[in-house]
Amino acid sequence: MRTVRDAKFVPQWVDLTQEYPAPLFGHITRQYLNLSYGGHPLQAVDLYLPEEGKPPFPTLILVHGGGFSRCDKRDLSVYPGFYALREGFALASVNYRLVPECRFPCQIHDVKAAIRFLKGHAGEYGLDPRSFFLYGDSAGGYLVSMVGATQHGSSLDGGAAGPEGESCAVRGVAAIAPLINLVRHYGQLERVDYLSPDLHKAMLEESSAILADYLGTPKGRLGALAEKASVDTYLTSAAPPFYIQHGTRDTIIPPIQAIDFAGRLRGLIGGEKVVLDLIEGAKHVGTSPEFIEEEHVLSILRFFRTLL
């Protein structure tokens, strides 16, 4: 069985001497690190500009996963963004406040604040504020989906974070293995039939604990917050185009979450604006190599190019 270490990496982009592959940044000459979009140390974004091409650049805003409680903007989840740089996109990798210090919905507010910050400074860094795209995996996939679903104003807008008057609207969203519906998730995971009994039990326990921590509720008792924190709750015909990528053997977030999400979106914004990319045999992002390999990343970037 292939693991992340078995991915078809670009050698100069990754350090394989560590236990878990780590991205390398030496090939990027134009870097602006730890740009602050808020008062907390984790409210920061790293910005990288392409080596070639003329500004203003379309911009990929990347939001890492990690169960809302861990990982960082310079972890391996940034690696797909290196392909975006090569293809002429600027890359912005975002940190956000983590559980338990910060719970729903502050992570959503943070991502929106980062978008507003980047738009407010677009001229300074050579970014095209009309061509911003979101990319997130796992918990990051949930966050970018929430931002996309609520980008035109809702109770989750987060107030006037970022430069006055800037919109957090984006041109398109790539959601990789996203959690979409918190109400149905546990029952869907219970019905997964491709896990061993021991692994199935462990995944149910882990999932229950992650969501309880994120919402600040007792484990197994998410209550009304589960609906309030579900992407489905906010979907309208104003949603941006989506590229949804998911593994058919995901052990943490069942692929039915992506399938149902794509179906709802197609009914609201039209089938031509929604791509559902199910990767046969792939497990959860971060454990399977497919999501960081060139063919699967370029398919997303090609979709984004059609939206420019």
Feature locations, PLM:
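Alpha/beta-hydrolase superfamily serine-hydrolase fold, recognizing
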Residues: 1-308
